[in-house]
């Protein structure tokens, strides 16, 4: 006969209890001593940096953490593109991106949006590629040195 597994409760998990939002969960009448670790109920959590979010108890037990600290969700003033990389956000093309703004996305977002450099070149690429250092393709093609130019410099230095 198979051995019966003993139920584990939220209160048995010290890491989850450290992030359990007592005030908000009490309002929902959630008791960590009654709710099991596999529960699909959405509880409130607060990470060590003070970010608050809702997630199922089961997903938290499986290892999901703060969506803001991990960059899965955008928190304006904390992990948004405008805050993380204002130099890149400065080239945001507000006209072509409509309602999308740099503070709506994390710097690691793979969303493809429009950009406009100081010379007026417009192009589309992902936010994370810009944050990783990819700049304006129009400006980079203007800066390319041709083989004959390299040859002239080489012979002049001899």
Regions found by a protein language model. Name each.
Residues 1-158:
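Functional cation/ligand-contacting sites centered on basic and imidazole/sulfhydryl donors
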């Amino acid at each position: 006969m198979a051995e019966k597994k003993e139920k584990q409760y939220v209160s048995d998990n010290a890491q989850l209890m450290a992030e359990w939002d007592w005030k908000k969960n009490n309002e929902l009448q959630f008791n960590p001593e009654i709710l099991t670790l596999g529960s699909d109920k959405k509880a409130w959590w607060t990470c060590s940096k003070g970010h608050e979010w809702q997630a199922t108890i089961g997903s938290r037990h499986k290892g999901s953490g703060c969506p803001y600290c991990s960059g899965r969700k955008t928190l304006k003033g904390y992990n948004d593109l405008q805050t993380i990389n204002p130099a890149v956000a400065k080239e945001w093309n507000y006209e072509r991106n409509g309602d999308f703004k740099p503070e709506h996305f994390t710097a690691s977002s793979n969303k493809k949006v429009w950009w406009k450099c100081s010379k007026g070149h417009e192009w589309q690429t992902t936010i994370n590629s810009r944050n990783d250092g990819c700049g304006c393709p129009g400006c980079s093609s203007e800066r390319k040195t041709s083989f004959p130019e390299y040859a002239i410099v080489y012979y002049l230095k001899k």
